[in-house]
């Protein structure tokens, strides 16, 4: 494959990412929107964890972003706030494909975050209030006591916590990878110097 065609075809990486995710949703048995999110702490030590990608935004002309939700006081929330950058990879074993993303971060704590929070189950909404994410916890019993307290305080229609919301990654690099025989994989990298620059696309060695 000397030029982009087939599964790599298209002029907008966000549209392409959406298409790949849609295929994964039809074939991947568990959490096709799971991503391994990487951040760094103040000392530059990397951290990685699995989170769920909730939206691939596509605004046309090669602009868009990737959105997930978290507690802003968590380790990842604090590291993202400090660095303003993050990376992730999503790998689909059923498709033998993956997407890697590196980019700049910003919080999404307006109506979009409110709407997503409201779409969650009541127990998940209350859990967001109860969990002081990433902080030490004496016991599971203590956590459940916090859940009971929050349930009594918030009732059946809790508002989104001010410390919980979305994070948008606006990419500077997106790589689309597909497995090839004898490890001769196909890799295409979309890259730009800033979010306002046009994308440059190149094939990479396996």
Curated annotation (Swiss-Prot):
Cofactors named for this entry: FMN
Keyword entries, A-Z: Flavoprotein, FMN, Oxidoreductase, Pyridoxine biosynthesis
Binding site for substrate: 54, 116, 120, 124, 183-185
Enzyme Commission identifier(s): 1.4.3.5
Free-text comment on the cofactor: Binds 1 FMN per subunit.
Pathways per UniProt: Cofactor metabolism; pyridoxal 5'-phosphate salvage; pyridoxal 5'-phosphate from pyridoxamine 5'-phosphate: step 1/1; Cofactor metabolism; pyridoxal 5'-phosphate salvage; pyridoxal 5'-phosphate from pyridoxine 5'-phosphate: step 1/1
Listed GO MF terms: FMN binding; pyridoxamine phosphate oxidase activity
Oligomer status and interactors: Homodimer.
Recorded family membership: Belongs to the pyridoxamine 5'-phosphate oxidase family.
Listed name of the protein: Pyridoxine/pyridoxamine 5'-phosphate oxidase
Taxonomic lineage: Bacteria, Pseudomonadati, Pseudomonadota, Alphaproteobacteria, Rhodobacterales
